[in-house]
Amino acid sequence: MEKDFLGDILSVRGEFGYWVFEGDTVPAQRPSWNYRKEDDGGIIIDMLCHWRYVLDNLFGNVKSVSCLGATHIPERVDEHGKRYKATTDDAAYATFQLENGIIAHFNSSWCVRVRRDDLLTVQVDGTRASAVAGFRKCYTQHYGNTPKPVWNPDIDQPIDFFEGWSEVPEQEEFDNAFKAQWELFLKHLYTDEPFPWNLKEGAKGVQ
């Protein structure tokens, strides 16, 4: 984005989540409090704060947000084998309007089966190119490689839409993200380097 590879950014689409087992036939891989409102659970409070700083720092300040939360699995089994009622959201469908006009939409769910490159993928569509990034890999499609599909549901799709994407080559090794964050904070403490990620920035995520 710094080199304007994508052109004018039009939209950002995020898909996050995976199937968290209910706990009866297969043990759940997330703690039961995640699904109880009385224990401060819920995917909205868990994930939307992350989407906020991703959008603010990469694409533009969030101007407004609308979010629909849902409790798709009404009952689960806890760590002790006891059934309990899910009292908070296990999926969230959020649309963000940024100050610069970019529209972002993020689906977050613990009730979805993964058919994408990673547990989180973010697609950025621009006038010159598009990019799809996961945690470790990124794929791009330039304007010149963009296929021209024609709507015809009566025949098999002749275009392999994955074929026109190219993986971005690794040009550097990235250290552990939490380690990098701690290093920035320690530099701020001992050398007074700027550190914009303060309590106010954290509070923005739960406004």
Question: What are the roles of these predicted feature ranges?
Answer:
Residues 29, 125-126, 153-154:
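Juxtamembrane/interface motifs at transmembrane-helix termini
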Residues 13, 93, 201-204:
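Residues within well-formed alpha-helices
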Residues 5, 52-145, 179-195:
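Contiguous beta-strand/loop segments that form the cofactor/metal-binding neighborhood of enzyme cores
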Residues 13-26, 137-162:
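Mobile, glycine-enriched helix-loop/loop "lid" segments at the mouths of ligand-binding/catalytic clefts
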Residues 122, 132, 151-207:
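C-terminal helical cap and adjacent loop that interface with cofactors, partners, or active-site loops
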Residues 33, 110, 164-166:
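Tryptophan-centered motif/residue detector
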Residues 1-85:
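Predominantly a Rossmann-like dinucleotide-binding segment in NAD(P)-dependent oxidoreductases
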